[in-house]
From Swiss-Prot:
Protein name per the record: Acyltransferase mokF
GO molecular function terms noted in the UniProt entry: acyltransferase activity; hydrolase activity
Extent of the signal sequence: none
Record-listed monacolin J binding positions: 93, 193, 208, 278
Length: 413
C-alpha cells in the first residue's frame, strides 16, 4: 500500500541534493545568483512547496556544465519508508516539452525531402485537410460548420497557426463537447485529441492546440514508422539515449523509478499524489504533442546537440531556422495580446509578460532583451510542459533546462 506524505512530513526526510558545477567562475556575478537560486529551491523543497526538481545548464563550448537535483521524485514513500530522490535519470512525463522532439522529427523529414515546410498537408493528412471550421451554434444548439479558407501547411502546424485549438482552451470547443458532439475520453487516446474541429483558418491567428499531435501523425505517414520507432532510431540512437520513450509501460526498468505527478490542495496548501491516467498510462498511440517520458539528462542531450549545431539531429542551418521568428506582424501582435490577456496559462514556460514575443519552429522567441530577475536575451528560444518543465536556449550564451514536478498549471484542487 502506498503511504502518503504531507508537506510538513517531507521536511525531515528530504534526499540530499546532488550537484555538478563547472565553469561558473567564468561568468560575471553568477556565483551569488546561483547560490541564491539553489537556496530558493532548497527552501521550496523543505517547506513542501515542491517535492523535487532538476536544474541543468550547458553552454556550446562545454566549459559550463551545471546540474543540481533537489528533493524527491514523489511524495509517496517507498517500501523502505523513504522518499526516493529526484535524479538526472529520473523518467519524467514531458507533456508539451515533447513538442520540441516532434518538431525535430518533422524537420528531419524536411531535410530528407519527405515533406516541405510550405507544402500543404493534403497528401499526408487528408483527414485534417477535410476538417471544417466550427463557427458557432444555431438556435437548436447544432454546430454551424463552414469550409476552411486556405490550406494547412507543416509550418502552420509547427507554429500553432493552423486554426486548431485544445478543447479546454477554446470556448467554442468546450461548448461543442458539452452539447455531446465530442466524447469525453475515458483513456489517454489519440482520437480524442485529433477529433475536435478547427476554430479558424490557417494563418489567421496563433492558437495553441493539437498541432504537434497531428505533426506526429505526419511523421509516421511520411516515414512509414511508428513515432516511437522513429524517435528511437533518429533521436535516441544518435545521442546514445536509452531512457526516452512514448511507451513507458513497456519499460519496467523506467516505470519503477519515474517521477510521480502531484498537485497542491487548495484547502491546506499541501502536495498530494495525483493518480492521473495521463501519468500512469501510455496513450493508445504516440502523442507527438505530449506523449514522451525522459530523464532530464537525456532531454539535455537533445537541446545541447541543437545548441552545439553538431549535425547529429539537424543540420546547422535548420537549427538556425528554428530561432527565426515565423509569424507575420499581424499574427505576432495577436499572439502577444492573447498571452497578455491570459497570464494564468503562461504557454510553455515563464516567458516574462513584459517581453515582446514571437513563435519559431519549436518554441517561443524573445524579440528583445530583458535584464534583472526575469533575465532574457533577444533571440532566446523557450518552451516547456505542463508539469512545470521549462527549457530556455540561446545559440550564443547560456542554455537552461528546468524540470519541476509538483502540479499542473491547471490542476490544483
Amino acid at each position: 500500500m502506498r503511504q502518503f506524505l504531507s508537506s510538513d512530513r517531507i521536511n525531515s526526510e528530504i534526499p540530499q541534493e546532488k550537484s555538478e558545477m563547472v565553469g561558473f567562475s567564468d561568468i560575471d556575478n553568477s556565483s551569488r545568483q546561483i547560490k541564491e537560486m539553489e537556496a530558493a529551491f532548497r527552501s521550496a523543497v523543505k517547506t513542501g512547496q515542491i517535492p523535487g526538481a532538476v536544474i541543468m545548464a550547458r553552454d556550446h563550448s562545454g566549459r559550463l556544465n551545471y546540474t543540481r537535483c533537489f528533493g524527491a521524485r514523489t511524495v509517496v514513500r517507498d517500501e523502505c519508508n523513504r522518499l526516493p530522490p529526484m535524479q538526472v535519470d529520473t523518467p519524467c512525463r514531458l507533456a508539451s516539452a515533447t513538442k520540441l522532439l516532434t518538431t525535430i522529427m518533422a524537420l528531419q523529414c524536411v531535410e530528407r525531402g519527405l515533406v516541405r515546410l510550405d507544402e500543404t498537408v493534403d497528401r499526408l493528412l487528408p483527414d485534417l485537410s477535410a476538417m471544417k471550421v466550427l463557427e458557432g451554434f444555431d438556435a437548436a444548439g447544432e454546430p454551424k460548420m463552414r469550409e476552411r479558407k486556405g490550406k494547412i501547411t507543416l509550418k502552420h502546424l509547427l507554429t500553432h497557426t493552423s486554426g486548431l485549438s485544445y478543447v479546454f482552451l477554446h470556448p467554442l470547443l468546450r461548448e461543442y463537447m458539452a452539447k455531446g458532439h465530442l466524447q469525453t475520453a475515458e483513456k489517454f487516446g489519440i482520437q480524442s485529441r485529433l477529433a475536435p474541429p478547427a476554430v479558424n483558418d490557417p494563418g489567421a491567428e496563433w492558437i495553441y492546440g493539437a498541432n504537434l499531435d497531428w505533426t506526429g501523425k505526419l511523421v509516421e505517414r511520411a516515414t512509414g514508422l511508428d513515432l516511437e520507432q522513429y524517435l528511437q532510431e533518429n533521436i535516441c540512437a544518435p545521442l546514445n539515449i536509452t531512457d526516452m520513450t512514448f511507451k513507458l509501460q513497456q519499460r519496467p526498468d523506467l516505470l519503477a523509478r519515474r517521477a510521480d505527478q502531484t498537485h497542491r490542495n487548495k484547502a491546506d496548501g499541501r502536495l498530494r499524489y495525483d493518480d492521473s491516467v495521463y501519468f500512469r498510462s501510455d496513450g493508445d498511440e504516440c502523442f507527438g504533442g505530449q506523449g514522451v517520458f525522459s530523464g532530464p539528462e537525456s532531454y539535455m542531450k537533445v537541446v545541447h546537440s541543437l545548441l552545439q549545431r553538431d549535425g547529429r539531429l539537424l543540420r546547422p542551418e535548420t537549427v538556425d531556422l528554428m530561432f527565426q521568428p515565423a509569424l507575420d506582424a499581424q499574427t505576432e501582435k495577436q499572439m502577444n495580446q492573447h498571452m497578455d490577456a491570459s497570464p494564468h496559462i503562461n504557454y510553455g514556460g515563464p516567458m516574462p509578460m513584459v517581453l515582446r514575443r514571437s513563435f519559431g519552429l519549436g518554441g517561443m522567441i524573445a524579440l528583445e532583451d530583458l535584464d534583472g530577475q526575469k533575465w532574457r536575451r533577444k533571440g532566446c528560444l523557450t518552451f516547456g510542459g505542463g508539469p512545470n518543465i521549462v527549457w530556455v536556449m540561446l545559440l550564443s550564451a547560456l542554455r537552461f533546462v528546468f524540470f519541476f514536478f509538483f502540479f499542473f498549471f491547471f490542476c490544483s484542487s
